[in-house]
């Protein structure tokens, strides 16, 4: 898969599912998040437990909390160094395409996630949020690593 900057097309609607290993010692698993390109306007939407989050206990949905492609910290107790991120999969299109519909849903309805106040290691977690969004669009198939523990929490 190409890198994010190589795939980015500011004339299209694109939804990227990004990943990064989670902090050591759990870095076998990966953390997923959405990067939305709405014809040149880029947003990062994710769910998780983050230090510095404005939510109670650090658990919640975040929009643009971190730069679009910034990976997770390598250790729980330090902000740096960070793992790199990668594109797990993406979809693109023009107005009224599945990419447009998915991008619009993530931007407008991410706060409707039913478990936005719950976080557990095996789920619900960041990957469960991505799985919940994708479940709303059964016509869209994304290839995501089996290391995304919690992705199928809603199935």
Show which residues each predicted segment covers:
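Non-catalytic ligand/cofactor/substrate-binding and regulatory segments of enzyme domains
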Residues: 1-122, 154-155
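Active-site nucleophilic cysteine motif
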Residues: 29-31, 117-138, 142-150
């Amino acid at each position: 898969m190409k890198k994010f900057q190589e795939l980015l097309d500011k004339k299209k609607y694109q939804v990227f599912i990004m990943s990064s290993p989670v902090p050591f010692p759990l870095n076998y698993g990966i953390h997923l998040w959405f990067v939305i390109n709405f014809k040149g306007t880029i947003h990062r939407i994710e769910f998780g437990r983050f230090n510095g989050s404005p939510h109670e206990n650090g658990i919640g949905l975040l929009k643009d909390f971190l730069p679009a492609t910034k990976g997770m910290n390598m250790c729980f107790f330090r902000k740096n160094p960070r793992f790199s991120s990668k594109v797990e999969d993406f979809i693109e299109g023009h107005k009224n395409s599945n990419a447009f519909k998915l991008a619009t849903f993530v931007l407008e309805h991410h706060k409707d996630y039913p478990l936005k106040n719950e976080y557990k290691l095996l789920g619900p977690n960041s990957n469960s949020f991505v799985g919940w969004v994708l479940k709303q669009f059964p016509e869209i198939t994304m290839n995501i690593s089996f290391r995304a523990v919690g992705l199928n929490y809603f199935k």
